[in-house]
């Protein structure tokens, strides 16, 4: 879960979400990413959800831009311009090349190893080493999502949103508020 900033409208749903995950018998750790202060905010909200069947791992952002690879996703956090410390996020999902069954058959790769090879895993079995490059074509275009919220226009948004398949940009003000904001 990536937090942009710690205003109530962006964090107050966390306790309910944590409790729902716990009730759904989640046991694997949950990673939270957010600006500096994340641990303090999460601990305060955990008063409502103190007992969970999974660990919470917090990553506090300290740089103007940081990139992580988690669970196969490449996540880039970048600062935007709000009245509190605030980040936007770009999430990219890389995609392997297409599986070539003909190549797998030509190389006598047993069917039971096709699935892990298709997922990009190397298989060592029966004295043989099977690698994804033996059966996968060139990498395919991945999926890129960019999310930003509660910010004034800044160059970093344009740079990160470039070539996104989905760009979500929540604005604070509508056209009717333009003149009032200019006056501020």
Language-model features: locations:
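A gly/proline- and charged-residue-enriched helix-loop-helix capping module
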Residues: 37-47, 58-63
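Short, charge-rich binding segments
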Residues: 22-25, 50, 80
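Hydrophobic packing residues within well-ordered alpha-helices of enzyme cores
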Residues: 14-17, 42-45, 157
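Generic structural signal for residues in well-ordered beta-strands
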Residues: 55-58, 75
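Metal-dependent phosphodiesterase/nuclease catalytic metal-binding core
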Residues: 62-184
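Active-site metal-binding motif and surrounding structural segment of the metallo-beta-lactamase
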Residues: 1-33, 57-62
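Glycine-rich, phosphate-binding/catalytic loops in enzymes
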Residues: 17-20, 49-51, 163-165, 184
